[in-house]
UniProtKB/Swiss-Prot annotation:
GO terms for biological process: translation. The lineage of its organism: Bacteria, Bacillati, Cyanobacteriota, Cyanophyceae, Acaryochloridales. Belongs to the universal ribosomal protein uS2 family. This is Small ribosomal subunit protein uS2. The keyword rRNA-binding does not apply. Residues 230-263 have a biased composition (Acidic residues). GO terms for cellular component: cytosolic small ribosomal subunit. Residues 228-263 are annotated as: Disordered. SUPFAM superfamilies: Ribosomal protein S2. It comes from Thermosynechococcus vestitus (strain NIES-2133 / IAM M-273 / BP-1). PROSITE patterns: RIBOSOMAL_S2_1 (PS00962).
Length: 263
């Protein structure tokens, strides 16, 4: 039985690509036709690649591999967080901080600071500080939670990255390449499929499309770890509308955690 049916993908708008003038020619093998100036993705190939990705991820999860979901665009951010937590994985759904993987040792010091501040907040120690200092500490805590909360329990680099929109997340892709981390990615007709290990051609701007595919990849992780699909608990503690428009590509941020005013 197929992981995803054509009917499911059609209903979610997975087949809608970008305007033909915005395409990446390397996506040509995955394009079915052009309608009203918009590329239509070949869903037969999408279904095959979703199944390939599902089996690959499930098998990796069975072996104890760890996964990092990456998706910072508005349409993907909430889904990435929800599905990563559902299957006990890590996630980045805000700005990608330069060096988040390649400079992990430094990033880890900020993660440790996040844990320290959370402990201080929970124990009431922040309340004992002068008002101005307490306010500054809480602002710092909020910033760290926003940008690093999804990797708070990540003690080592992930084994596999699952990315929504490799064109937008180009810095994350580059860091994965440098470190030899395999990439499974949902990518639209304006992306380069040669940049990833398993490309899943799909509408990466429609919420329902993203939810459908990212949800299936999260299912694969959960099934690999637990042997069946049930509603899981977050499992991190032990580990050191069908829009067709795209959001603008976001620039990568420096290693410093940005202030909220810069977000």
């Amino acid at each position: 039985m197929a992981v995803l049916s054509l009917a499911q993908m059609l209903e979610a708008g997975v087949h809608f690509g970008h305007q033909a003038r915005r395409w990446n020619p390397r996506m040509a093998p995955y394009i079915f036709t052009v309608r009203n100036g918009v590329h239509i993705i070949d869903l037969v190939q999408t279904a095959q690649l979703v199944e390939e990705a599902y089996n690959y991820i499930r098998n990796a999860a069975e072996k104890g591999k760890r996964f990092l979901f990456i998706g910072t665009k508005r349409q993907a951010a909430g889904i990435v967080e929800q599905e990563a937590l559902r299957c006990g994985s890590y996630y980045v759904n805000q700005r990608w901080l330069g060096g988040m993987l390649t400079n992990w040792t430094t990033i880890k010091t900020r993660v440790d600071r996040l844990k320290e501040l959370e402990s201080m907040e929970e124990s009431g120690l922040i309340d004992l500080r002068p008002k101005q200092e307490a306010s500054a500490l809480r602002r710092e805590l909020a910033r760290l939670q926003k940008y690093l909360g999804g990797i708070k329990q990540m003690r080592r680099l992930p084994d596999i990255a699952i990315i929504v929109d490799v064109k937008r997340e180009y810095n994350a892709v580059a860091e994965c390449h440098k470190l030899g981390i395999p990439i499974v990615a949902l990518l639209d007709t304006n992306c380069d499929p040669t940049q990833v290990d398993i490309p899943i051609p799909a509408n990466d701007d429609a919420i329902r499309s993203i939810k459908l595919i990212v949800g299936k990849l999260a299912d694969a992780i959960y099934e690999g770890r637990h042997g069946q699909l049930e509603e899981p608990e977050a499992d991190l503690a032990d580990e050191d509308d069908n829009g067709m428009t795209t959001s603008d590509d976001g620039d990568a941020e420096a290693l410093d955690i940005p202030d909220d005013s810069d977000a």
